[in-house]
Amino acid sequence: MDSGLRSLLSDHSRYVESFRLFLLNSTEHQCMQRFIDTQFPHIVSSIGKDKSVIDILGIGSGSGEIDLQMIGKIQSRHPGVAISNQIVEPSAEQIIGYKERVAKAPNLGAVSFSWHRQTSSEYERQVNEEKQMRSYDFIHMIQMLYYVKDVPATLRFFKSCLAPNGKLLIILVSGNSGWSMLWKKHGPQLPLNDLCLYVTAGDIAQMLSSMGARFQSYELPSDMDITECFIEGDRNGEMLLDFLTETCDFKRNAPADLREQILCDLKSPECSTTRDGKVIFNNNLSVIVVERD
């Protein structure tokens, strides 16, 4: 890794801006929405059986857009049952956005929300120190396992937090996505550190199998328009490139040979296709649903 490269996560405002651009340019949330509309209701049909309150834990929930969609489906599947929703999210900006979203949302009268500004590791440490293990009927970790130091330990801990019939839902980039190729080839040259791990759903499936965990996997086709990355001086393109490489100001700070190689690889068939003159990146996701033992 070149010591002049800094993780995008070291500049929180830039990370949030690049993430918002990523969502605008990709079908990330749309493909999750399709999954929530079609497959998700069946997945949560058995959670919280015979309980008066369904306990939910969101890890790295961001601004809550996907959370509220899932809560809506859980409400439909379990009418009249109260929901306690605990949110663990390290970003103050995202928590503010989540609270604003809740304030505008209808039909949440039976749902209580509690926000905890902390990382998943901090939450785990707090639970262990207080020795007050709380069990949850549904735990979700969407696009966040890149940001933990010890993935297998994190999986084991949150799996242990599941109540009877509980489900742990994980969403990550697919092992057949453009991300996988990009990370495997260039990860050693990018600012891989305590802030970010280059891990795919394929890696998670292997870890869960080695634990003897029961789980199911679902593939979510998704793409992202990265055409602007190839336009010189285009700020949106530069921000998207930051997000793709998890590097702060990659275009300006990366060595010329690395920059050219990554731009070349982003256009390769392993990463992208060309459609109507646009470069469309393979952003495929995988959903993994883990069951309690």
Curated annotation (Swiss-Prot):
Keyword Repeat in record: no
Residue ranges crossing the lipid bilayer per the database entry: none
Known EC number: 2.1.1.8
Molecular function per GO: histamine N-methyltransferase activity
Class of enzymatic activity (EC top level): transferase
Gene3D superfamilies, per the entry: Vaccinia Virus protein VP39
GO BP term, example: histamine catabolic process
SUPFAM superfamilies registered for this protein in UniProt: S-adenosyl-L-methionine-dependent methyltransferases (SSF53335)
CDD domains, A to Z: AdoMet_MTases
Sequence positions that bind substrate: E28, N283
Keyword vocabulary terms for this entry: Cytoplasm, Methyltransferase, S-adenosyl-L-methionine, Transferase
InterPro entries: HHMT-like, SAM-dependent_MTases_sf
Catalytic activity: histamine + S-adenosyl-L-methionine = N(tau)-methylhistamine + S-adenosyl-L-homocysteine + H(+)
Family annotation (Pfam families): Methyltransf_23
Compartmental location: Cytoplasm
Binding locations of S-adenosyl-L-methionine: G60, E89, Q94, S120, I142
Taxonomy, superkingdom: Eukaryota
One cellular component term from this protein's GO annotations in UniProt: cytoplasm
Family: Belongs to the class I-like SAM-binding methyltransferase superfamily. HNMT family.
Purpose: Inactivates histamine by N-methylation. Plays an important role in degrading histamine and in regulating the airway response to histamine.
Quaternary structure note: Monomer.
Designated name of the protein: Histamine N-methyltransferase
Organism per entry: Xenopus tropicalis
Higher taxonomy: Eukaryota, Metazoa, Chordata, Craniata, Vertebrata
